[in-house]
A protein has these predicted regions:
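Outer-membrane beta-barrel pore domains and translocons
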Residues: 27-29, 68-70, 119-121, 200-204, ...
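Bacterial Sec-dependent N-terminal signal peptides
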Residues: 1-25, 241-247
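Transmembrane beta-strands of outer-membrane beta-barrel proteins
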Residues: 20-26, 63-65, 100, 114-120, ...
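Outer-membrane beta-barrel "beta-signal"
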Residues: 29, 190-194, 231-247
């Protein structure tokens, strides 16, 4: 009995003194693109989830490596484009990645820590959706009259009326994107009773798009020529809630 008690005490002390931790976490992202197309893009909300393995080196310093999934959404402000009886005014690009963040956490004060990470990410999916207002004509004759004028605007034409708000898949984003994206991040976190609230800002180091696969077309509000050389990088803020488990 005494031997069993000593064994249990030894295991408990080892667990308490372990320098290894595991932290599952999940939260939201606020993303945009930085680069030549930044003026046409704005923030949109996505989500992220994953788990970090930590190894404490000292009282203040901890090395971490993790694996996670991030869905970044970017709003594409395409301006107003009239196609027949549809008025396109917004697009949303979605980039989904499996992330492997590698970094260091430094304890600043009590539960407050700062972090610095490098994160390679493998793209798993990508898509683009365009949103539009659709209008309709009451009769075939009205449609002929509306279509006879190439400058007709369905929002003001006497031959049309508003029908619905809808969207369609733009396609091609995954094919035109780099499969590997590398970013760096800086952040702050606060831990209380193993519950950790974290905020990180991620700076893309590589281009989101593969410039060799971009088409030659113009679809921006100023109708500037799209030369296929745009070099945009992903920038996003992640806010997560995690729980630290001692190993």
């Amino acid at each position: 009995m005494a031997s069993l008690l000593m064994l249990l005490t030894s295991v408990a002390m080892t667990a308490q003194e372990s320098n290894w931790t595991l932290m599952p976490k999940a939260g939201m992202t606020v993303s945009t693109l930085a680069g030549e197309d930044a003026e046409y893009c704005s923030n949109a909300i996505g989500w992220t989830a994953g788990v970090d393995l930590g190894r404490r080196l000292s009282e203040r310093v901890e090395l971490t490596v993790g694996v996670g999934f991030t869905k970044n959404v970017v709003k594409d402000d395409i301006g107003t484009s009239i196609v027949s009886i549809r008025v396109f005014d917004e697009g949303r690009m979605t980039f989904e990645y499996i992330d492997v963040p590698i970094g260091v956490n430094v304890k600043l004060w009590q539960g407050l820590s700062a972090s610095l990470d490098v994160q390679p990410s493998l793209m798993t999916a990508g898509k683009e959706r365009f949103f539009y207002d659709e209008y309709a004509c009451d009769s075939f004759e009205d449609r002929v009259k509306f279509m006879s004028n190439p400058y007709s605007d369905p929002r003001t034409s006497e031959y049309t009326h508003f029908l619905k708000r809808d969207s369609e898949d733009g396609g091609g984003i995954r094919h035109m994107s780099n499969k590997l994206n590398v970013s760096a991040s800086i952040g702050l976190s606060y831990e209380y009773r193993r519950v950790t609230l974290g905020a990180r800002y991620h700076f893309g180091l590589t281009n989101v798009m593969d410039t060799d696969k971009l088409p030659m077309y113009s679809h921006y509000p100023d109708q500037s020529e799209y030369d296929g050389r745009h070099k945009d990088k992903l920038r996003y803020l992640s806010l997560t809630l995690g729980y630290r488990i001692g190993l």
